[in-house]
A protein has these predicted regions:
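Pyridoxal 5′-phosphate
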Residues: 1-184
Length: 184
C-alpha cells in the first residue's frame, strides 16, 4: 500500500473541483485579455474566481494575483518589493522555502541587500523578540516569514508578526501555501 503525506504540495484533485474545471479545460481557451466574446466570457469567470478567493481571504479582489505556484509568487513579491521600494534589508528565517531563500541570496548578490536571519526555537517557531530587535536596527526592511513549514510542522503566529511589522512600518510577506486551506 502506498501512503502519500505531502498533500500541501500536490494533492489529488477533488471530484467536485474537477467537475467545475472540466468545461474550462475542454473549451475555456479564450484569451481573457481579448475583446472578443470568448475572451470576455473567460475574463468574467476569472474575475468571479478572483472575487471568491478574495472573500475567503478577507481582502480585495485587486489584491489577488494568479501565478503558476508558490515559488513564482514568492519570487515575484520579494524581488519586486525589495527592488521597487529600495529596501535595504530582508529579514527572514533559515527555515524558509528555497524560493524565499534563493530570492534573498539573489538580492544580496546582485543588489547588495542585507539579509538578516531571525532566530527560532527548537520547534522552528520564530523568536518575536529577536525579530523586533532586527526590525529596530534595520528600519528600511522587508520581513518574510512562512506561516507553516510542511517539513517540520511549525506554525508561526503571523498575526503577531504582522502587528510588529505594522508598528515598525515594515513590509511583511508570508508564504502561506502550506496552510491557507486550513485556517480562517
Amino acid at each position: 500500500m502506498n501512503v502519500y503525506f505531502d498533500n500541501a504540495a500536490t494533492t489529488p484533485m477533488d471530484k467536485k473541483v474537477l467537475e467545475k474545471m472540466l468545461p474550462y479545460l475542454e473549451n475555456g481557451f479564450g484569451n481573457p485579455s481579448s475583446i472578443h466574446k470568448k475572451g470576455r466570457e473567460i475574463k468574467s469567470v476569472i474575475e468571479k474566481c478572483r472575487s471568491k478567493i478574495a472573500s475567503l481571504l478577507s481582502c480585495e479582489p485587486g489584491e489577488i494575483f494568479f501565478t503558476s505556484g508558490g515559488t513564482e509568487a514568492d519570487n515575484m513579491f520579494i524581488l519586486n518589493t525589495a527592488i521597487e521600494k529600495k529596501l535595504d534589508t530582508i529579514i527572514t528565517s533559515k527555515l524558509e522555502h528555497h524560493a524565499v531563500l534563493h530570492s534573498c541570496e539573489y538580492l544580496e548578490r546582485s543588489y547588495k541587500k542585507n539579509i538578516k536571519f531571525v532566530e527560532s526555537d527548537e520547534k522552528g517557531v520564530i523568536d518575536l523578540d529577536h525579530l523586533e530587535s532586527l526590525m529596530k536596527s534595520n528600519p528600511n526592511s522587508l520581513v518574510t516569514i512562512m506561516h507553516g513549514n510542511n517539513e517540520i510542522g511549525n506554525l508561526n503566529d503571523i498575526k503577531k508578526i504582522s502587528r510588529i511589522c505594522e508598528q515598525y512600518k515594515t513590509v511583511f510577506h508570508s508564504d502561506t501555501v502550506q496552510t491557507v486551506g486550513h485556517y480562517n
